[in-house]
């Protein structure tokens, strides 16, 4: 379905291994420290930090660990030179791929990502080559099992300014404009909702199907990109088969 994130298209989320969780927490921890160091360690006065905290909580990072990273940022840790960079390219079968990274060495990161694309039947492209195929939106995902009253969830989401609400495959997916994301998320938090995903994403406007051979290459490409230490998020318009 066009205009919805991958959550609405995949019935079963794969459980992350302990190693994957550890790597994810390391990346989120670095993001927390950099944002806290650059814009201040108080979430009340740092909206960027509030958004990263929400993202970390949605990925099951314990609050004491989140606060530990923020406290470290107030110390002597060096976060200079880090910047957010977005890379664009193509996977096998012409799949559009967007990679969001945080790096302190853009040449190193670009070289590593180019190698990963080349190795898996894709190529790293120029800025703007595929981003026009995506829409930047806030995405909030809630498990139905935790909050079975669908009408109430939808009512509250729309009340706080959500653009769209869908209910399928055991989840509610709430879409917001990037500008209203924090307002909607914080409003729903005050109502007592918890999220399994809460962040601003690039959502494909159309999806591409792949042959089984290209699908294997694409899965490998995504896994290798996500495994890279500098990569925060990978977005694509491959229509994965439901398992």
UniProtKB/Swiss-Prot annotation:
This is Probable transcriptional regulatory protein Athe_0816. It is found in: Cytoplasm. Pfam families: TACO1_YebC_N (PF20772), Transcrip_reg (PF01709). The keyword DNA-binding applies. One of its GO terms (cellular component) is cytosol. GO terms for biological process: regulation of DNA-templated transcription. Keywords: Cytoplasm, DNA-binding, Transcription, Transcription regulation. GO terms for molecular function: DNA binding. The keyword Phosphoprotein does not apply. It comes from the Bacteria. Its main location: cytoplasm. Belongs to the TACO1 family.
